[in-house]
């Protein structure tokens, strides 16, 4: 009938709203466009930066050459760091205890070793990666027996040449970061960056994000937050 056809035509002409969302890019994609990046993760918030560090380490390894005669290590690129804009990475991970670090420590150990090889064969190069780990469950004033924990960690590092908690060359800090000291150190001392060069990327709890955002504003660092 005409009425049936009319209703069918009206349904066909009716506009159906369509909403298209995403994909949304991550702020981490800007990392390689920066000169000096500070990657900060709170707990599992470090996950977005694991792949970045893994990729950077792969670039070092891809250009590594081992001599068949003497097993000496060299790199095919004159300067890996000169070939890209990114010159320096500070990796900061704030976590409750050592157990939460275990899954990622192997990658950090490998990167430390790769950097040592690279610096040994390129004496004029500067350190590319600095690692800063924080255990928040342990306090500065804690003792092992009657001996201060801080003293034990220092002696162990001197004797063993590695951190007592992680076996990394980088020192593990106990307690929460003192952000004024951390950020102040980025723009002071030898080979320091300028505030304009420092870009801070963070992923973690919102309360921690606000604290870091405020300090970035004070030091005039660019701040990027990955949704936790």
PLM feature segments, named:
Residues 42-68, 80-92:
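Classical protein tyrosine phosphatase
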Residues 1-30, 72-228:
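Reductase modules of NAD(P)H-dependent flavoproteins
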Residues 35-42:
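Beta1/beta-strand and adjacent pyrophosphate-binding region of the FAD-binding site
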Residues 28-34, 63:
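Helix-loop boundary elements of multi-pass alpha-helical membrane proteins
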Residues 38, 50-53, 57, 108, ...:
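Generic hydrophobic alpha-helical scaffold/packing signal
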């Amino acid at each position: 009938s005409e009425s049936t056809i009319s209703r069918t035509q009206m349904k066909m002409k009716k506009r159906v709203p369509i909403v298209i969302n995403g994909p949304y890019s991550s702020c981490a994609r800007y990392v390689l466009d920066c000169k000096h990046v500070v990657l900060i993760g709170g707990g599992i918030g470090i996950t977005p930066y694991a792949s970045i560090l893994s990729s950077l380490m792969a670039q070092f390894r891809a250009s590594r050459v081992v001599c068949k005669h003497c097993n000496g290590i060299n790199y095919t690129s004159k300067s890996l760091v000169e070939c890209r804009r990114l010159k320096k990475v500070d990796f900061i991970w704030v976590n409750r205890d050592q157990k939460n670090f275990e899954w990622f420590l192997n990658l950090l150990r490998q990167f430390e070793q790769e950097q040592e090889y690279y610096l040994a064969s390129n004496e004029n190069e500067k350190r590319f990666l600095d690692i800063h780990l924080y255990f928040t469950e342990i306090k500065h004033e804690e003792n092992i027996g009657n001996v201060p924990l801080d003293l034990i960690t220092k002696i162990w590092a001197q004797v063993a040449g590695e951190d007592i908690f992680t076996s990394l060359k980088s020192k593990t800090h106990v307690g929460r970061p003192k952000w004024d000291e951390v950020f102040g150190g980025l723009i002071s001392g030898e080979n320091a960056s300028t505030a304009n060069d420092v870009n801070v990327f963070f992923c973690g709890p919102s309360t921690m994000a606000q604290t870091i955002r405020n300090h970035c504003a004070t030091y005039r660092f660019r701040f990027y937050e990955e949704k936790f």
